[in-house]
Curated annotation (Swiss-Prot):
This is Proteasome subunit alpha. NCBIfam families: arc_protsome_A (TIGR03633), PRK03996.1 (NF003075). It is found in: Cytoplasm. Belongs to the peptidase T1A family. It comes from the Archaea. PROSITE patterns: PROTEASOME_ALPHA_1, PROTEASOME_ALPHA_2. It holds the Pfam family Proteasome_A_N. It comes from Natronomonas pharaonis (strain ATCC 35678 / DSM 2160 / CIP 103997 / JCM 8858 / NBRC 14720 / NCIMB 2260 / Gabara) (Halobacterium pharaonis). Its main location: cytoplasm. Keywords: Cytoplasm, Proteasome.
Length: 255
């Protein structure tokens, strides 16, 4: 009984380590990330690809209200998984940091610099009483000094750099697919294909353009960050035979 009450005390105390060195509220925040739909980031030779699963819960919901890919700056995109409201707060923070850097130094913020600013902000909420950790993970991808960079933030406030990663639901299965098929020599087109195939691998090998968000940040593109339209996504799905059949889509609607 005493052990159980001690366990509950560590559960409630965001600033208290358990005897085995764990912060339970941070671990619970990571569980919240797993409840969000999947997001994927892939670093290619000439850019970064971001793909997200943004299926809506009801046909009555406006699709444009579901945002999982965000533009932080002309050369940086961010994908999220977990609590949408928490993601929005961090996206706004990242955008402010990018603007401040541009005004202060008259140059675009570095991808690593922005990531560490965001993770420092996240980390503060793991050691302050009266607050809770952010229940969201971000994939931050962009171009820095002509080179693609790809980072992950997690609820503990730790930044990780990746070649390819997934966050959110089915992370383990998607990550396993990426590890098996990723190559450092991928170009952006091949990176888009790999991300879509990885997401399809946990969705019965079929996807709909309405349920997918896709963006790229490329070295050669003057605009840098670019979000693809439904028509462009549909073309990529058709090219790889990943487009969900209309009969299957109708059955899903009936369910």
């Amino acid at each position: 009984m005493q052990g159980q009450s001690q366990q509950q005390a560590y559960d409630r105390g965001i600033t208290i380590f358990s005897p085995d060195g764990r912060l339970y509220q941070v671990e619970y925040a990571r569980e919240a990330v797993k409840r969000g739909t999947a997001s994927i980031g892939i670093r290619t030779e000439d850019g970064v690809v971001l793909v997200v699963d943004k299926r809506i819960r009801s046909p009555l919901m406006e699709r444009t209200s579901v945002e999982k890919i965000h533009k932080a700056d002309d050369h940086i995109g961010i994908a999220s998984a977990g609590h949408v409201a928490d993601a929005r707060q961090l996206i706004d923070f990242a955008r402010r940091q990018a603007q401040v850097n541009q005004l202060r130094y008259d140059e675009p913020i570095g991808v690593e610099t922005l990531t560490k600013a965001v993770t420092d902000h996240i980390q503060q909420y793991t050691q302050v009483g009266g607050a809770r950790p952010f229940g969201v993970a971000l994939i931050i991808g962009g171009i820095e000094d002509g080179e693609p960079r790809l980072y992950e933030t997690d609820p503990s406030g730790t930044p990780y750099e990746w070649q390819a990663l997934a966050v959110g639901a089915d992370r383990g299965d998607i990550q396993e697919y990426l590890e098996e098929h990723y190559s450092e020599s991928l170009d952006t087109e091949a990176g888009i294909g790999l991300a879509l195939e990885a997401l399809a691998s946990v969705n019965d090998d079929s996807l709909t353009p309405e349920g997918i968000g896709l963006a790229t940040v490329t070295v050669d593109d003057d605009d840098g960050f670019s979000q693809l339209s439904d028509e462009e996504i549909e073309a990529h799905l058709e090219e790889r035979d990943l487009l969900e059949a209309e009969d299957d889509a109708d059955e899903d609607d009936e369910e």
